[in-house]
Swiss-Prot record:
This is Interleukin-15. The lineage of its organism: Eukaryota, Metazoa, Chordata, Craniata, Vertebrata. One of its GO terms (molecular function) is cytokine receptor binding. GO terms for cellular component: extracellular space. Residues 1-29 form the signal peptide.
Length: 162
């Protein structure tokens, strides 16, 4: 069925919505819902901290030592502070390599959690477009232990910006 007058329909929907809300907020429970909704809209968003990312990285480091995983990954060893977001994105892409190469469920779960934590922490940061930074493929390939040490160093740059 095709509606010929969408403007009229949206007006009707707005009227029904207004009537529904007006009747709902006349009750005491409706007022409580409204007040709690306003309060929750003003609460700060809970975000993952970079400390959790570091603890996951250390856990991955221990797990990799225990299973003797050997991989070479693109690693940013001396990132400029103005390129830390670009470097972090490269590290997160390389984590996916660990995810694919690892057959250990503990490592896979921890890596997936770390990717989610780091991405949510990154999304809360306002940053300018970084220019003059190396692309991921331009970085030197290093073993997984060096990769994790450099990753921790980059995360610390987010914790202690200087």
């Amino acid at each position: 069925m095709r509606i010929l007058k969408p403007c009229l329909r949206s007006t009707c929907i707005q009227c029904y919505l207004c009537l529904l809300l007006n009747s709902h907020f006349l009750t005491e429970d409706g007022i409580h819902v409204f007040i709690l909704g306003c309060i929750s809209a003003g609460l700060p968003k809970t975000e993952a901290t970079w400390q959790h990312v570091i603890s996951d990285l250390k856990k991955i480091e221990d797990l990799i030592r225990s299973i003797h995983m050997d991989a070479t990954l693109y690693t940013e060893s001396d990132a400029h502070p103005n390129c830390k977001v670009t470097a972090m994105k490269c590290f997160l892409l390389e984590l996916r390599v660990i995810l694919q190469e690892s057959r250990n469920s503990d490592i896979s779960d921890t890596v997936e959690n770390l990717i989610i934590l780091a991405n949510s922490s990154l999304s809360s940061i306002e940053y300018k477009t970084e220019s003059g930074c190396k692309e991921c493929e331009e970085l030197e390939e290093k073993n997984i232990n060096e990769f994790l040490k450099s990753f921790i160093h980059i995360v610390q740059m987010f914790i202690n910006p200087s």
